[in-house]
Amino acid sequence: MEKYILSIDQGTTSSRAILFNQKGEIAGVAQREFKQYFPQSGWVEHDANEIWTSVLAVMTEVINENDVRADQIAGIGITNQRETTVVWDKHTGRPIYHAIVWQSRQTQSICSELKQQGYEQTFRDKTGLLLDPYFAGTKVKWILDNVEGAREKAENGGLLFGTIDTWLVWKLSGKAAHITDYSNASRTLMFNIHDLEWDDELLELLTVPKNMLPEVKPSSEVYGKTIDYHFYGQEVPIAGVAGDQQAALFGQACFERGDVKNTYGTGGFMLMNTGDKAVKSESGLLTTIAYGIDGKVNYALEGSIFVSGSAIQWLRDGLRMINSAPQSESYATRVDSTEGVYVVPAFVGLGTPYWDSEARGAIFGLTRGTEKEHFIRATLESLCYQTRDVMEAMSKDSGIDVQSLRVDGGAVKNNFIMQFQADIVNTSVERPEIQETTALGAAYLAGLAVGFWESKDDIAKNWKLEEKFDPKMDEGEREKLYRGWKKAVEATQVFKTE
């Protein structure tokens, strides 16, 4: 009887359940979207119970639709949208407020106040993160400050906090396991990534009671078992947890120091495994925990690009220049170059290494001869220039020259982007056969804990190359194009709305 690992990929807009066999191949997928709530401008929230219901639905569907029995599931791995914050009643199990999503800016004033009080460097040194509404800590404080009776209840031990992984493990285990893993804990602004413990000073600054925090565990370990009534009467080990970008790093088998993966999703996320060293960034990168496994922790440098694949959606939905995302490739390849046109897609500001939240999108170099093809090509090229910006920052901070770039996410299907990426970073780009690397990473972590896979070497053998893109552009051309991009970014930052 064939066994499988069930991976739950709980994302920002949908929940997915994916079955993987021992070769790391997909044996079934189910997906369900859920509602986004926008109570005020810049606020983004989810209903944690809707997320839980969607997860139950996809787990049931993937098993039923693929003629798999529950006793064929060897273990469950969970990967999640990071930073999204849930606070719930320990006794009733009900969330006391909507889940505050990673994108939400409703805690900006808390961050500003802590910065004014001079604590930015304290947070940076201990957590590797920026003092920004993006991360979970200020979201917990906001809920405790704004929900009536919440703070008193928390101080009396009546509330629990968790990122989405914690919430799902708690629900699946029938309230038995209140845990998170190192990768998710490292995104909270409350966890000291050097001591590997919740930090009392940071908790005091955020006024968050320690008793509501989950226990922090390795990313690969049996945390508990499914309560029988949630899983067809079976008690299945819940055995792997990692935040989505760290899970993708693991799913890409980036196990060695200097290994890098880049995800081209709505935004772009590049992570470099820095081994057992937490590298302090001087270039606007985040220092974070990649995963904890085999009794030790691996660290990573992370760069964030705010607009990546969503630039292609903008061409389709906003400008109506294309009817479908794949069409962008055929338009881009009809011309040999952009004829000097640059698109800087700073629609919501610029991420790593600029961190300029006030910059807005801009286009440079238009002439009467500029056609739709040039414009589309320039938009696609912008994804690659931004990736080089991040990669250069990583090499500078780590002292490691990137030898190859493993890629995943929706935009990697576009061969033009992949080739231009290789050309502009002067590094080979490797596209894997299985591009569901986030879910695969969670499956691998769970599978290692239950003996489904023996070792990381076992997993590395599963990684198969679909296509490799080697750089073909000459050095002079590459540097001339990149100088133009840097000039365009500089001009974008000069031109800001009043």
From Swiss-Prot:
Any idea which positions bind glycerol?
Answer: 82-83, 134, 244-245
Q: Where does ATP bind?
A: 12-14, 266, 309, 313, 410
Q: What class of enzyme is it?
A: transferase
Q: Could you tell me which Pfam families the record lists for this protein? A: FGGY_C, FGGY_N
Catalytic activity annotation:
glycerol + ATP = sn-glycerol 3-phosphate + ADP + H(+)
Q: Which PANTHER family match?
A: GLYCEROL KINASE, SUGAR KINASE
Describe its function: Key enzyme in the regulation of glycerol uptake and metabolism. Catalyzes the phosphorylation of glycerol to yield sn-glycerol 3-phosphate.
According to its UniProt record, which protein family does this protein belong to?
Belongs to the FGGY kinase family.
Name of this chain's protein: Glycerol kinase
The record lists the organism as Staphylococcus aureus (strain bovine RF122 / ET3-1)
